[in-house]
Amino acid sequence: MTTSVRTRFAPSPTGFIHLGNIRSALYPWAFARKMKGTFVLRIEDTDVERSTSESVDAILEGMAWLGLDFDEGPFYQMQRMDRYREVLKQMQDEGLVYLCYMSTEELDALRERQREAGEKPRYDGTWRPEPGKVLPEPPAGVQPVLRFRNPLNGVVAWDDAVKGRIEISNEELDDLVIARPDGTPTYNFCVVVDDLDMRITHVIRGDDHVNNTPRQINILRALGGEPPVYAHLPTVLNEQGEKMSKRHGAMSVMGYRDAGYLPEAVVNYLARLGWSHGDAEIFSREQFVEWFDLEHLGKSPAQYDHDKLNWLNAHYIKEAGNVRLAELARPFFAGLGIDEAMLAQGADLTAVVGLLKDRASTVKEIAENAAMFYRAPAPDAESLTQHVTDAVRPALADLAAALKAVEWTREAIAAALKATLGAHKLKMPQLAMPVRLLVAGTTHTPSIDSVLMLFGRDVVVSRIEKALA
């Protein structure tokens, strides 16, 4: 019987979650969906001092926004302490761990001596029981840690789905602390128990965990388990070539939503940030799941490219429905000084979005470009002097009169403009520029007939006539 694929995303809720972090959710999610398996969310919150509920909320919100639904969880490590203690007791009973009374000061001094001798700093096994070995007397008043009896010889090996065959000599590994003096278990121990209990078959995570892997494999095997398939993803770099982080200016996942990016664009971009399917750059979520495999995960660090994300987002904005985009654009108007009442009184927002979306890289940009439809024009004096000249005023007056009478369609407006140009022997920019300026307050708009149609006859005519009065 084939074992069902079970993957997991196991973030620590200690603050910021950026694109590099959430990629470690996207790939295991996609693999689980591709293999018709199970995707588990586990919150590794044993760092009590740094873990916050706000960070948990940010993780859940980011996953929900990107559509990374999980089948089981969220499981919180702090709620599994009884289970960890049960396994620790089992390991003590089986002689897999031992009490170590070496103080932090003694350990620091030991490591310093090793460094001075040119040796790799490591615990020397002072308190490790061995046949015929006499252990020191436990010092009074010292709470011991629990250390795992790592194998003394042999190698730990695994075939990493990204990095290939990795072999680590057990002589390189010291006996890991798996429970602190107060009895609380450590990270590497909790991860192993969780992966075992949750029957995780594939661990897809950042390559900053590679050094933890041999230790985790040894603990896993001591508990009678078999290692999952590991796929260690190379780091995501920012545009300056540094590891992506808040300190180096990375934006949070939800920051992209708040900047006007569409979730499907971010998912598409993230998918290509360390994985490829031939030369395909644009693909749907469904296509991504169908194509995704571990064999085509990149082996080199991926570098974030903001221009490429903007290009992808512009593509998805063009493809998106106008009603949806209008709703997504609404929250951005408040920051532009435009309230709901002003939106209601101005041009139809859905139609405005339809006109402007082909020129925008973000939904926020759509709102910024749409603002002219919802507030009074305020052209600068220099532009007025340049474009609204005495020579063009008669043409503006005739155009206003013509627009009062025509059917209010884009074609009829275009015909009125063309007739006015012919009557006054003007070129289109000579008339369109002042009209744009007087009606919209700017010379930068899409096609003049489309813009005027959305402003509406009353607004267009009154603004031109007011300027001529």
From Swiss-Prot:
Region annotation Disordered: residue ranges?
Answer: 114-139
Q: Which domain of life is it from?
A: Bacteria
This protein's UniProt keywords? Aminoacyl-tRNA synthetase, ATP-binding, Cytoplasm, Ligase, Nucleotide-binding, Protein biosynthesis
**Compartments, as annotated in UniProt:** Cytoplasm
Write out the biased-composition intervals (Basic and acidic residues): 114-131
Cross-referenced Gene3D superfamilies:
1.10.10.350, Glutamate-tRNA synthetase, class I, anticodon-binding domain 1, HUPs
Q: Where is this motif: 'HIGH' region?
A: 11-21
Task: Report the top EC class in one word.
Answer: ligase
Which amino acids does the record list as binding ATP? Answer: 246
Record motif 'KMSKS' region, residues: 243-247
Q: Which residues form a coiled coil?
A: none
Q: Which residues cross the membrane?
A: none
Q: Which GO terms describe its biological process?
A: glutamyl-tRNA aminoacylation
Catalyzed reactions: tRNA(Glu) + L-glutamate + ATP = L-glutamyl-tRNA(Glu) + AMP + diphosphate
Q: Cross-referenced InterPro entries, in alphabetical order?
A: aa-tRNA-synth_I_cd-bd, aa-tRNA-synth_I_codon-bd_sub2, aa-tRNA-synth_I_CS, aa_tRNA-synth_I_cd-bd_sf, Glu-tRNA-ligase_bac/mito, Glu-tRNA-synth_I_codon-bd_sub1, Glu/Gln-tRNA-synth, Glu/Gln-tRNA-synth_Ib_cat-dom
Q: Name one GO molecular function term.
A: ATP binding
This protein's GO cellular component annotations are: cytosol
Subunit structure comment from the entry: Monomer.
Identify its protein family.
Answer: Belongs to the class-I aminoacyl-tRNA synthetase family. Glutamate--tRNA ligase type 1 subfamily.
**What HAMAP family does the record point to?**
Glu_tRNA_synth_type1 (MF_00022)
Q: What is this protein called?
A: Glutamate--tRNA ligase
Q: Which organism is it from?
A: Paraburkholderia xenovorans (strain LB400)
